[in-house]
Regions:
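Short, flexible loop/turn segments at beta-strand junctions in immunoglobulin-like
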Residues: 411-416
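Active-site-proximal segment of zinc-dependent metalloprotease catalytic domains
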Residues: 85-104, 108-113, 125, 129-266
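Solvent-exposed, acidic/flexible segments
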Residues: 117-121, 239-247, 323, 339
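Generic detector of well-ordered alpha-helical segments enriched in charged/polar residues
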Residues: 121, 129, 190-194, 203-205, ...
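Secretory targeting and sorting signals
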Residues: 1-36
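Zymogen propeptides/activation segments of proteases
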Residues: 2-4, 32-133, 371-383, 387-393, ...
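Generic structural hydrophobic/aromatic packing signal, biased to beta-strands
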Residues: 1, 48-50, 105-108, 146, ...
Length: 458
């Protein structure tokens, strides 16, 4: 399911490239001048996010669209026939339904040789398990398909590990020390797109770099740049904190959440209300008066340990704009929780991209009185989710059929009266994690069949 295109609009976006100067003063490490990456000449750039240290707040910076020429696969070191046979192989790590009904994640490894692809698959499984251990990913993981694509590198590991002068010949040209910043792992997005295209569908891409060193990055809003997927996260394979980078970045791509951290030099936000569901210029009284943003959650105890309110500082600006809680995973990675408004926004994003209710029976073809109608539910009643399945005939609920995943029109009371009838299956997620009626509508799926009630039971 293609994620609805959208560009993250944050209060901080108006600052543009002025952020680069700030980053120079705040970055954890700075590469030697001689080791600074040099683009391969194609031009263009991406704005990416990275986290200078485990558990810390993020930073954003403009980086070249193309990886440095020195980090790419050498033209003189092509793959052997056996390696080429492995390169681009697609695996089904966790496929739960049709690509039309799911949010499709593609995981690609970089810095894994042909003999290390089993290691890549183990790392992909482990990293996705880390992400889906967090709510609301845990409760809604069956709305995702997860595919792997094998990318064979000529050398093990990636450039910049352990030092800025280390150069590796890898499939995706991933490298530490991007933009002279040690923990920032950039990759060649065009190469990523080429490998991701091997999978049946790709809404989001995760690039796992074969490294024990902490690092990663997040590219979002890529559909607006013409890519088929909306976000790419990079992360190192063998650092325990790197998975949180992807969990945060998916918050942007799927939940449309803004960053909640700030830059002291940005001062006071003087613009109008922002689009993000987790930033506002309104006070609690104004939120209630305007029935805006997270007013339904005000005063509630939050998974982050805070109470939902308005806490000054968000979307890069320390003053004049507010976030829902004192901390969350969108503010710093020392928190592994989305706050309640953020959690609701994530669930909305899951349902924008995926369908909880599906069937193999064509809804465009009329069914007969005795035809068995079977549906599947991707989301049940575990964790946060509370999916309620009901059946209707001509708009009237058949209470006795609640929860059934297989019925016949006859069992629902359709009579063989020669008239046409409508049978509808409706799945509604009645989770307490949703309070906004608009999000509840997204969490509602319906399938309808016409019934030819002609007296024939087959």
């Amino acid at each position: 399911m293609r994620i609805r295109p959208g560009t993250r609009r944050t209060a901080g976006s108006v600052a543009g490239l002025a952020l680069a100067g700030l980053l120079a003063a705040t970055a954890v490490g700075t590469a030697p001048a001689a080791a600074a990456p040099t683009g391969n000449g194609a031009g263009g750039s991406h704005r990416v996010e990275y986290f200078p240290q485990p558990g810390g707040a993020g930073r954003t910076v403009e980086v070249p669209a193309d990886a440095p020429a020195r980090t790419g696969r050498s033209s003189g070191a092509s793959l052997s026939a056996a390696e080429s046979a492995v390169d681009g192989t697609v695996g089904e790590q966790a496929v739960t339904g049709s690509t039309d009904d799911r949010l499709d994640v593609v995981i690609i490894g970089d810095g894994y040789t042909a003999d290390q692809q089993d290691d890549f698959h183990a790392d992909a499984t482990a990293k996705w398990a880390d992400i889906t251990a967090l709510e609301p990913y845990r409760s809604y993981q069956n709305l995702f398909n997860v595919w792997t694509v094998d990318a064979v590198s000529n050398e093990s590991g990636i450039s910049g590990d352990p030092g800025a002068d280390v150069v590796k010949d890898t499939a995706l040209s991933s490298y530490f020390w991007c933009a002279d910043t040690e923990r920032l792992v950039c990759t060649d997005i065009d190469k990523v797109a080429s490998y991701a295209a091997e999978a049946p569908a790709a809404d989001l891409v995760v690039v796992i770099a074969n490294s024990t060193k902490y690092g990663g990055a997040g590219y979002s809003g890529l559909q607006a740049e013409g890519y088929p997927f909306n976000g790419v996260s990079t992360l190192s394979s063998d650092h325990s904190s790197s998975s949180l980078i992807a969990a945060h970045e998916i918050g942007h791509s799927v939940g449309l959440l803004e960053d909640e951290y700030t830059y002291p030099s940005y001062g006071t936000w003087t613009g109008g209300e922002t689009d993000g569901p987790n930033s506002t210029t309104y006070t609690p009284a104004q939120l209630i008066e305007k029935r805006a943003k997270w007013y339904r959650w005000l005063g509630q105890s939050d998974p982050t340990g805070s109470t939902v309110g308005t806490y000054e500082g968000s979307a890069y600006y320390p003053y004049g704009i507010y976030r829902p809680t004192s901390t969350s995973i969108m503010r710093e990675l020392s928190s592994t929780d989305f706050n309640l408004p953020g959690r609701e926004a994530m669930i909305a994003g899951f349902y924008r991209a995926g369908n909880a209710l599906s069937t193999s029976l064509d809804t465009n073809t009329a069914v007969k009185y005795g035809k068995r109608i079977t549906v599947s539910l991707a989301v049940g009643t575990t964790g946060l989710a509370r999916t309620d399945l009901r059946w209707y005939v001509d708009g009237v609920e058949k209470v006795h059929a609640r929860g059934r995943t297989a019925v016949t029109p006859g069992s629902l009371g359709v009579r063989a009266d020669g008239r046409s009838h409508k049978v509808t299956a409706e799945a509604v997620d009645r989770t307490d994690a949703i309070r906004d009626p608009a999000v509840r509508a997204l969490a509602t799926d319906r399938l309808t069949w016409s019934v030819r009630a002609t007296g024939h039971r087959k």
